[in-house]
Amino acid sequence: MTVDTLARLCTAVRGKVLVNEPLAGHTSLKVGGPADYFAIPADLADLEELIKVVRSLSLPYFIIGGGFNVLVGDGGFRGVAISLKELNGMESPSRGRIRAEAGATNQQLVNYATGKELTGLEFLSCIPGTIGGALSVNAGAHGQSTMEQVETLITMRDGRIFENEGRKRNFGYRYLELEPGEIVVAAVFSLSEGKAEAIGEKLESYRRHRLESQKIGYPNAGSFFKNPEGQQAWRLIDEAGFRGFQVGGAQVSEIHTNFLVNRGGASAADFITLAGMIKQKVLERSGILLQEEVRILDEYEQK
Protein backbone atom coordinates (compact mmCIF):
# COMPACT_ATOMS: atom_id res chain seq x y z
CA MET A 1 0.00 0.00 0.00
CA THR A 2 1.21 3.48 -0.82
CA VAL A 3 -0.12 6.97 -0.24
CA ASP A 4 0.00 7.62 -3.99
CA THR A 5 -2.08 4.52 -4.76
CA LEU A 6 -4.68 5.49 -2.18
CA ALA A 7 -4.80 9.03 -3.55
CA ARG A 8 -5.33 7.75 -7.11
CA LEU A 9 -8.15 5.45 -5.99
CA CYS A 10 -9.87 8.13 -3.91
CA THR A 11 -9.68 10.56 -6.82
CA ALA A 12 -11.20 7.99 -9.18
CA VAL A 13 -14.15 7.03 -6.99
CA ARG A 14 -17.07 9.22 -5.95
CA GLY A 15 -18.03 6.47 -3.55
CA LYS A 16 -15.89 5.18 -0.68
CA VAL A 17 -12.40 3.70 -0.47
CA LEU A 18 -11.48 1.94 2.77
CA VAL A 19 -7.99 0.78 3.77
CA ASN A 20 -7.13 -2.56 5.41
CA GLU A 21 -10.80 -3.50 5.48
CA PRO A 22 -11.45 -6.90 7.15
CA LEU A 23 -13.30 -9.06 4.63
CA ALA A 24 -14.80 -11.29 7.30
CA GLY A 25 -17.47 -8.64 7.74
CA HIS A 26 -18.36 -8.79 4.06
CA THR A 27 -18.64 -12.57 3.59
CA SER A 28 -21.36 -14.93 4.76
CA LEU A 29 -18.84 -17.38 6.28
CA LYS A 30 -17.52 -14.56 8.52
CA VAL A 31 -13.88 -15.40 7.83
CA GLY A 32 -11.14 -13.72 5.82
CA GLY A 33 -8.31 -11.28 6.38
CA PRO A 34 -8.15 -7.65 5.24
CA ALA A 35 -8.14 -6.27 1.72
CA ASP A 36 -5.53 -3.59 1.14
CA TYR A 37 -8.29 -1.46 -0.37
CA PHE A 38 -12.07 -1.86 -0.30
CA ALA A 39 -13.82 0.32 -2.87
CA ILE A 40 -17.55 1.03 -3.07
CA PRO A 41 -18.32 2.79 -6.37
CA ALA A 42 -21.40 5.00 -6.30
CA ASP A 43 -22.86 3.84 -9.61
CA LEU A 44 -22.01 2.18 -12.93
CA ALA A 45 -20.07 5.17 -14.27
CA ASP A 46 -18.07 5.24 -11.05
CA LEU A 47 -17.26 1.54 -11.46
CA GLU A 48 -16.08 2.14 -15.04
CA GLU A 49 -13.63 4.81 -13.91
CA LEU A 50 -12.45 2.75 -10.94
CA ILE A 51 -11.66 -0.28 -13.11
CA LYS A 52 -9.65 1.87 -15.51
CA VAL A 53 -7.56 3.28 -12.65
CA VAL A 54 -7.09 -0.11 -10.96
CA ARG A 55 -5.88 -1.59 -14.24
CA SER A 56 -3.54 1.35 -14.88
CA LEU A 57 -2.00 0.73 -11.45
CA SER A 58 -1.70 -3.04 -12.20
CA LEU A 59 -3.53 -3.82 -8.97
CA PRO A 60 -5.17 -7.21 -8.43
CA TYR A 61 -8.90 -6.85 -7.85
CA PHE A 62 -12.01 -8.88 -7.34
CA ILE A 63 -15.72 -8.17 -7.21
CA ILE A 64 -17.69 -8.87 -4.06
CA GLY A 65 -21.47 -8.88 -3.97
CA GLY A 66 -23.31 -10.35 -1.02
CA GLY A 67 -20.23 -12.40 -0.13
CA PHE A 68 -22.20 -15.67 -0.22
CA ASN A 69 -20.08 -17.54 -2.71
CA VAL A 70 -16.55 -16.65 -1.68
CA LEU A 71 -14.05 -17.85 0.91
CA VAL A 72 -11.25 -15.33 1.48
CA GLY A 73 -7.98 -16.58 2.95
CA ASP A 74 -6.83 -15.56 6.43
CA GLY A 75 -4.06 -13.46 4.88
CA GLY A 76 -6.63 -11.29 3.15
CA PHE A 77 -6.22 -9.83 -0.32
CA ARG A 78 -3.29 -7.78 -1.59
CA GLY A 79 -5.26 -5.59 -3.92
CA VAL A 80 -8.69 -3.99 -4.30
CA ALA A 81 -11.94 -5.62 -3.27
CA ILE A 82 -14.77 -3.89 -5.13
CA SER A 83 -18.25 -3.91 -3.64
CA LEU A 84 -21.20 -3.43 -5.99
CA LYS A 85 -23.73 -2.86 -3.22
CA GLU A 86 -24.57 0.65 -4.47
CA LEU A 87 -25.33 -0.67 -7.97
CA ASN A 88 -28.76 -1.86 -6.92
CA GLY A 89 -31.22 -0.15 -9.27
CA MET A 90 -34.24 -1.87 -10.81
CA GLU A 91 -36.72 -0.76 -13.43
CA SER A 92 -39.27 -2.21 -15.80
CA PRO A 93 -38.51 -0.77 -19.27
CA SER A 94 -41.50 -2.55 -20.79
CA ARG A 95 -44.20 -5.04 -19.81
CA GLY A 96 -42.69 -8.38 -18.87
CA ARG A 97 -39.14 -7.06 -18.58
CA ILE A 98 -37.09 -6.07 -15.57
CA ARG A 99 -33.63 -4.51 -15.69
CA ALA A 100 -31.72 -5.15 -12.46
CA GLU A 101 -28.23 -4.04 -11.50
CA ALA A 102 -25.76 -6.53 -10.08
CA GLY A 103 -25.77 -5.19 -6.52
CA ALA A 104 -29.50 -5.70 -5.97
CA THR A 105 -30.26 -8.74 -3.85
CA ASN A 106 -32.06 -11.75 -5.24
CA GLN A 107 -34.88 -11.17 -2.77
CA GLN A 108 -35.26 -7.54 -3.87
CA LEU A 109 -35.64 -8.70 -7.46
CA VAL A 110 -38.19 -11.34 -6.48
CA ASN A 111 -40.17 -8.74 -4.52
CA TYR A 112 -40.06 -6.30 -7.44
CA ALA A 113 -41.24 -8.94 -9.91
CA THR A 114 -43.97 -10.12 -7.54
CA GLY A 115 -45.23 -6.56 -7.15
CA LYS A 116 -45.66 -6.37 -10.91
CA GLU A 117 -47.29 -9.83 -11.05
CA LEU A 118 -44.46 -11.25 -13.16
CA THR A 119 -43.47 -14.89 -12.73
CA GLY A 120 -40.32 -16.86 -13.48
CA LEU A 121 -37.91 -15.72 -10.78
CA GLU A 122 -39.56 -17.16 -7.68
CA PHE A 123 -36.78 -19.74 -7.31
CA LEU A 124 -34.33 -16.90 -6.58
CA SER A 125 -36.04 -16.45 -3.21
CA CYS A 126 -34.20 -19.65 -2.20
CA ILE A 127 -30.78 -18.24 -3.09
CA PRO A 128 -29.12 -15.66 -0.82
CA GLY A 129 -26.87 -13.00 -2.27
CA THR A 130 -27.01 -10.59 -5.17
CA ILE A 131 -28.11 -10.66 -8.79
CA GLY A 132 -24.53 -10.27 -9.96
CA GLY A 133 -23.43 -13.28 -7.96
CA ALA A 134 -26.37 -15.38 -9.12
CA LEU A 135 -25.68 -14.52 -12.76
CA SER A 136 -21.91 -15.02 -12.53
CA VAL A 137 -22.32 -18.66 -11.48
CA ASN A 138 -25.73 -19.24 -13.08
CA ALA A 139 -27.19 -20.04 -9.68
CA GLY A 140 -30.33 -22.12 -9.62
CA ALA A 141 -32.88 -24.01 -7.56
CA HIS A 142 -35.98 -26.14 -8.12
CA GLY A 143 -34.96 -27.04 -11.67
CA GLN A 144 -34.47 -23.45 -12.84
CA SER A 145 -31.37 -21.33 -13.34
CA THR A 146 -30.79 -17.59 -13.46
CA MET A 147 -29.41 -17.31 -16.99
CA GLU A 148 -32.45 -19.09 -18.45
CA GLN A 149 -34.49 -16.00 -17.60
CA VAL A 150 -32.05 -13.46 -19.09
CA GLU A 151 -32.87 -11.60 -22.29
CA THR A 152 -29.85 -9.29 -22.19
CA LEU A 153 -26.68 -9.70 -20.14
CA ILE A 154 -24.79 -6.48 -19.44
CA THR A 155 -21.12 -6.80 -18.57
CA MET A 156 -18.04 -4.63 -18.20
CA ARG A 157 -14.61 -5.46 -19.59
CA ASP A 158 -11.58 -3.18 -19.57
CA GLY A 159 -13.80 -0.37 -18.32
CA ARG A 160 -16.25 -0.68 -21.24
CA ILE A 161 -19.88 -1.82 -21.27
CA PHE A 162 -21.07 -4.71 -23.44
CA GLU A 163 -24.60 -6.02 -24.01
CA ASN A 164 -25.26 -9.56 -25.25
CA GLU A 165 -28.35 -11.65 -25.81
CA GLY A 166 -28.60 -14.02 -22.88
CA ARG A 167 -29.27 -17.06 -25.07
CA LYS A 168 -26.04 -16.44 -26.99
CA ARG A 169 -23.90 -16.71 -23.87
CA ASN A 170 -22.32 -20.04 -22.99
CA PHE A 171 -23.78 -21.22 -19.69
CA GLY A 172 -24.68 -24.43 -17.92
CA TYR A 173 -25.02 -25.95 -14.47
CA ARG A 174 -23.53 -23.44 -12.00
CA TYR A 175 -21.51 -21.95 -14.83
CA LEU A 176 -21.41 -18.84 -16.99
CA GLU A 177 -18.52 -18.36 -19.38
CA LEU A 178 -16.94 -14.97 -18.79
CA GLU A 179 -13.85 -13.47 -20.38
CA PRO A 180 -10.89 -12.72 -18.07
CA GLY A 181 -11.73 -9.52 -16.22
CA GLU A 182 -15.35 -9.49 -17.44
CA ILE A 183 -17.79 -8.31 -14.75
CA VAL A 184 -21.55 -8.83 -14.71
CA VAL A 185 -23.06 -5.42 -13.94
CA ALA A 186 -26.75 -5.83 -14.87
CA ALA A 187 -29.26 -7.92 -16.77
CA VAL A 188 -32.65 -7.60 -18.41
CA PHE A 189 -34.97 -10.45 -17.44
CA SER A 190 -37.86 -11.53 -19.67
CA LEU A 191 -40.73 -12.82 -17.55
CA SER A 192 -44.29 -14.04 -17.96
CA GLU A 193 -47.40 -12.45 -16.55
CA GLY A 194 -48.79 -14.31 -13.57
CA LYS A 195 -51.46 -14.19 -10.92
CA ALA A 196 -50.52 -12.70 -7.56
CA GLU A 197 -52.13 -15.61 -5.69
CA ALA A 198 -50.26 -18.27 -7.69
CA ILE A 199 -46.95 -16.44 -7.32
CA GLY A 200 -47.52 -16.13 -3.57
CA GLU A 201 -48.30 -19.83 -3.24
CA LYS A 202 -45.11 -20.78 -5.07
CA LEU A 203 -43.02 -18.47 -2.89
CA GLU A 204 -44.57 -19.94 0.25
CA SER A 205 -43.87 -23.47 -0.99
CA TYR A 206 -40.23 -22.61 -1.60
CA ARG A 207 -39.98 -20.90 1.80
CA ARG A 208 -41.32 -23.98 3.61
CA HIS A 209 -38.96 -26.26 1.70
CA ARG A 210 -35.99 -24.12 2.64
CA LEU A 211 -36.97 -24.02 6.30
CA GLU A 212 -37.35 -27.78 6.38
CA SER A 213 -34.12 -28.66 4.59
CA GLN A 214 -31.77 -25.69 5.04
CA LYS A 215 -32.49 -24.08 8.40
CA ILE A 216 -28.79 -24.14 9.18
CA GLY A 217 -28.53 -21.61 12.01
CA TYR A 218 -24.82 -20.75 11.56
CA PRO A 219 -22.86 -18.60 9.11
CA ASN A 220 -22.43 -20.49 5.84
CA ALA A 221 -21.91 -19.99 2.12
CA GLY A 222 -24.80 -22.12 0.93
CA SER A 223 -23.89 -25.23 -1.05
CA PHE A 224 -20.13 -25.60 -0.78
CA PHE A 225 -19.70 -28.17 -3.57
CA LYS A 226 -21.31 -28.55 -6.98
CA ASN A 227 -23.46 -31.59 -7.60
CA PRO A 228 -21.57 -34.03 -9.86
CA GLU A 229 -23.54 -35.16 -12.89
CA GLY A 230 -26.17 -37.66 -11.81
CA GLN A 231 -25.15 -37.36 -8.15
CA GLN A 232 -25.93 -35.24 -5.11
CA ALA A 233 -22.95 -33.78 -3.30
CA TRP A 234 -24.66 -33.88 0.09
CA ARG A 235 -25.27 -37.62 -0.23
CA LEU A 236 -21.65 -38.35 -1.19
CA ILE A 237 -20.44 -36.30 1.77
CA ASP A 238 -22.91 -37.97 4.12
CA GLU A 239 -21.98 -41.46 2.95
CA ALA A 240 -18.32 -40.60 3.54
CA GLY A 241 -19.17 -40.04 7.21
CA PHE A 242 -18.77 -36.29 7.47
CA ARG A 243 -22.14 -35.27 8.94
CA GLY A 244 -21.29 -33.09 11.95
CA PHE A 245 -17.53 -33.49 11.40
CA GLN A 246 -15.56 -30.47 12.59
CA VAL A 247 -12.13 -28.92 12.01
CA GLY A 248 -11.50 -26.04 14.36
CA GLY A 249 -14.55 -23.80 14.12
CA ALA A 250 -15.62 -25.15 10.71
CA GLN A 251 -18.19 -27.94 10.68
CA VAL A 252 -20.16 -30.00 8.19
CA SER A 253 -23.77 -29.13 8.98
CA GLU A 254 -25.77 -31.86 10.69
CA ILE A 255 -28.86 -30.66 8.81
CA HIS A 256 -27.50 -30.44 5.25
CA THR A 257 -24.09 -32.00 4.62
CA ASN A 258 -23.25 -29.80 1.62
CA PHE A 259 -23.29 -26.79 3.94
CA LEU A 260 -20.07 -26.02 5.83
CA VAL A 261 -20.80 -23.76 8.78
CA ASN A 262 -18.88 -21.47 11.11
CA ARG A 263 -19.62 -22.69 14.62
CA GLY A 264 -17.71 -19.75 16.04
CA GLY A 265 -14.10 -18.66 15.77
CA ALA A 266 -13.45 -20.52 12.52
CA SER A 267 -10.58 -19.49 10.28
CA ALA A 268 -10.44 -19.70 6.52
CA ALA A 269 -7.77 -22.37 6.99
CA ASP A 270 -10.28 -24.47 8.95
CA PHE A 271 -12.69 -24.41 6.01
CA ILE A 272 -9.98 -25.12 3.45
CA THR A 273 -8.68 -28.06 5.49
CA LEU A 274 -12.18 -29.47 6.01
CA ALA A 275 -13.04 -29.12 2.33
CA GLY A 276 -9.81 -30.87 1.37
CA MET A 277 -10.55 -33.78 3.70
CA ILE A 278 -14.05 -34.15 2.26
CA LYS A 279 -12.78 -34.14 -1.32
CA GLN A 280 -10.12 -36.74 -0.57
CA LYS A 281 -12.44 -39.14 1.25
CA VAL A 282 -15.23 -38.85 -1.33
CA LEU A 283 -12.71 -39.47 -4.12
CA GLU A 284 -11.40 -42.58 -2.36
CA ARG A 285 -14.89 -43.97 -1.77
CA SER A 286 -16.62 -43.11 -5.02
CA GLY A 287 -13.98 -42.09 -7.52
CA ILE A 288 -15.69 -38.69 -7.81
CA LEU A 289 -13.68 -35.50 -7.31
CA LEU A 290 -15.99 -32.85 -5.88
CA GLN A 291 -15.62 -29.33 -7.20
CA GLU A 292 -16.16 -26.29 -5.01
CA GLU A 293 -19.15 -24.11 -5.78
CA VAL A 294 -17.64 -21.55 -3.41
CA ARG A 295 -14.75 -19.54 -4.83
CA ILE A 296 -11.63 -19.79 -2.67
CA LEU A 297 -9.63 -16.58 -2.95
CA ASP A 298 -6.13 -16.31 -1.55
CA GLU A 299 -4.23 -13.10 -1.00
CA TYR A 300 -2.23 -13.32 -4.22
CA GLU A 301 -4.90 -14.30 -6.73
CA GLN A 302 -5.53 -11.75 -9.47
CA LYS A 303 -8.84 -11.13 -11.17
From Swiss-Prot:
Its cofactor is FAD. One of its GO terms (cellular component) is cytosol. Pathway: Cell wall biogenesis; peptidoglycan biosynthesis. Its main location: cytoplasm. InterPro entries: FAD-bd_PCMH (IPR016166), FAD-bd_PCMH-like_sf (IPR036318), FAD-bd_PCMH_sub1 (IPR016167), FAD-bd_PCMH_sub2 (IPR016169), MurB (IPR003170), MurB_C (IPR011601), MurB_C_sf (IPR036635), Oxid_FAD_bind_N (IPR006094). It is found in: Cytoplasm. Gene3D superfamilies: 3.30.465.10, UDP-N-acetylenolpyruvoylglucosamine reductase, C-terminal domain, Uridine Diphospho-n-acetylenolpyruvylglucosamine Reductase, domain 2. SUPFAM superfamilies: FAD-binding/transporter-associated domain-like, Uridine diphospho-N-Acetylenolpyruvylglucosamine reductase, MurB, C-terminal domain. The keyword Cell division applies. Its EC number is 1.3.1.98. GO terms for molecular function: FAD binding; UDP-N-acetylmuramate dehydrogenase activity. Keywords: Cell cycle, Cell division, Cell shape, Cell wall biogenesis/degradation, Cytoplasm, FAD, Flavoprotein, NADP, Oxidoreductase, Peptidoglycan synthesis. The keyword ATP-binding does not apply. GO terms for biological process: cell division; cell wall organization; peptidoglycan biosynthetic process; regulation of cell shape. It holds the Pfam family FAD_binding_4. It catalyses: UDP-N-acetyl-alpha-D-muramate + NADP(+) = UDP-N-acetyl-3-O-(1-carboxyvinyl)-alpha-D-glucosamine + NADPH + H(+). Residues 30-194 form the FAD-binding PCMH-type domain. The active site is at 174, 223 (proton donor), 293. Belongs to the MurB family. Cell wall formation. This is UDP-N-acetylenolpyruvoylglucosamine reductase. It comes from Geotalea daltonii (strain DSM 22248 / JCM 15807 / FRC-32).
